[in-house]
Amino acid sequence: MFLRSVTRAAARSSAVPTTGLRSYRTVSGPMACLNARPQTEKKSIAPQQTRAASEHAISNPTLAGIEKRWEAMPPQEQAELWMQLRDRMKVDWHQMTLQEKKAAYWISFGPHGPRSVPPKGENLKIFFKVAQLTLVSFGIFYVIHLFAKPQPKTMTKEWQEASNEYAKQEKINPIYGISAEGYEGKGFVQSPPAEKQ
């Protein structure tokens, strides 16, 4: 039984390739002796197809006014036109028309999409909006401080001067601070005098 199945399998996969497979087999393969004929069919098809797609210039009406029409074109048409230009750019650039060169440059680097120029007056709108929000933030700040508790008693000039005297008596920071010889700084004083009530 095993012998019969092996002979059937061997008959189905014969060592001699069919004509359909022969054109795609390389000469350096294990069946090189059976594939001694040159493979002209395979090599002649691909260059003709790519040459045919890229040798014909794209029509001028298609490329005329592309700067004005590009944003309004559907994405499918944009993709098709770009693919045509991409295939066209694979040939020598001296064979491309001036319209094709301009269109390829504009589609690649033109002011559309994320590179579009901002509309007129946008900078002025941004300035006014920033100024408006800054004024609102100052207003919120002063409203919060209006309803805040009064400053603590330690935030008066008199209290801070008394803190300076205490620091000198206790010789706090005698090297660089208020107790050092020749010290000329303000010490702890940082607030205005207390308001008289």
Swiss-Prot record:
It is a single-pass membrane protein. It comes from the Eukaryota. The chain crosses the membrane at residues 130-147. Keywords: Membrane, Mitochondrion, Mitochondrion inner membrane, Oxidoreductase, Transit peptide, Transmembrane, Transmembrane helix. Pfam families: COX4. Pathway: Energy metabolism; oxidative phosphorylation. CDD domains: Cyt_c_Oxidase_IV. Coiled coil: none annotated. InterPro entries: Cyt_c_oxidase_su4_fam, Cyt_c_oxidase_su4_sf. GO terms for cellular component: mitochondrial inner membrane; respiratory chain complex IV. It is found in: Mitochondrion inner membrane. The keyword Plastid does not apply. Residues 1-13 form a transit peptide. GO terms for molecular function: oxidoreductase activity. SUPFAM superfamilies: Mitochondrial cytochrome c oxidase subunit IV. Residues 14-129 are mitochondrial matrix. Component of the cytochrome c oxidase, the last enzyme in the mitochondrial electron transport chain which drives oxidative phosphorylation. The respiratory chain contains 3 multisubunit complexes succinate dehydrogenase (complex II, CII), ubiquinol-cytochrome c oxidoreductase (cytochrome b-c1 complex, complex III, CIII) and cytochrome c oxidase (complex IV, CIV), that cooperate to transfer electrons derived from NADH and succinate to molecular oxygen, creating an electrochemical gradient over the inner membrane that drives transmembrane transport and the ATP synthase. Component of the cytochrome c oxidase (complex IV, CIV), a multisubunit enzyme composed of a catalytic core of 3 subunits and seevral supernumerary subunits. The complex exists as a monomer or a dimer and forms supercomplexes (SCs) in the inner mitochondrial membrane with ubiquinol-cytochrome c oxidoreductase (cytochrome b-c1 complex, complex III, CIII). Belongs to the cytochrome c oxidase IV family. This is Cytochrome c oxidase polypeptide 5, mitochondrial. It comes from Aspergillus niger.
